[in-house]
Design a protein with these regions (language model features):
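Catalytic-core segments of class I nucleotidyltransferases/pyrophosphorylases
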Residues: 11-12, 19, 25-32, 45-46, ...
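Small/polar loops that bind or transfer phosphate-bearing groups
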Residues: 15-16, 40
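A structural signal for short hydrophobic beta-strand segments in well-ordered beta-sheet cores
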Residues: 51-54, 110
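Active-site nucleotide-sugar/metal-binding loop of Leloir-type enzymes
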Residues: 1-10
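A short, conserved acidic/glycine-rich loop-to-beta-strand motif
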Residues: 34-44
Length: 145
């Protein structure tokens, strides 16, 4: 896409496997007020599995069924400046290499998103998301028809 972006311009980037109601206008505004090359939306999410704590003898001392994770995740809605292309080397992983490289130069920001986010990585998630859509109860649908 580099040939389609003007030098000095910013552009939006997202993954194709997540749905969210990220406020794009606020994301762009946050990106523009900082001196970064890229900004991604970050949110808390729930564990896909039950989380346990154990004592030294492996006796379970607590069990939290699919509790909220402590750290935030990149939920995949991003604003990038043209300069991001200076950090991309060939066909390496954008998440594993490019974003880490940008972060190492103190040019990567995270925009706090406290709204809806759901990845669609499994068949079960696809069924649930399609059900929400069919029931006209999709939290990510923030536009009017």
């Amino acid at each position: 896409i580099k040939s389609e972006i003007e030098k000095g311009d910013s552009f939006m980037l997202t993954y194709g496997d997540g749905l969210s109601n990220v406020d794009i206008s606020k994301l762009i505004k946050f990106h523009k007020k900082n001196d970064g090359v890229a900004t991604f939306s970050a949110t808390k999410t729930k564990s896909r599995f039950g989380v346990i704590e154990t004592d030294k003898q492996n006796l379970v001392t607590s069990f939290d069924e699919k509790g909220e994770l402590e750290n935030r995740i990149n939920c995949g809605f991003m604003v990038c400046d043209y300069e991001v292309f200076n950090y991309i080397n060939g066909d390496e992983s954008f998440e594993q290499k490019t974003l880490k490289n940008i972060a190492s130069k103190n040019k990567l920001y995270a925009y706090d998103h406290n709204g809806y986010f759901q990845p669609m990585d499994t068949y079960r998630e696809a069924i649930e998301l399609n059900k929400l859509w069919k029931e006209n109860n999709a939290p990510w649908k923030v536009w009017n028809d």
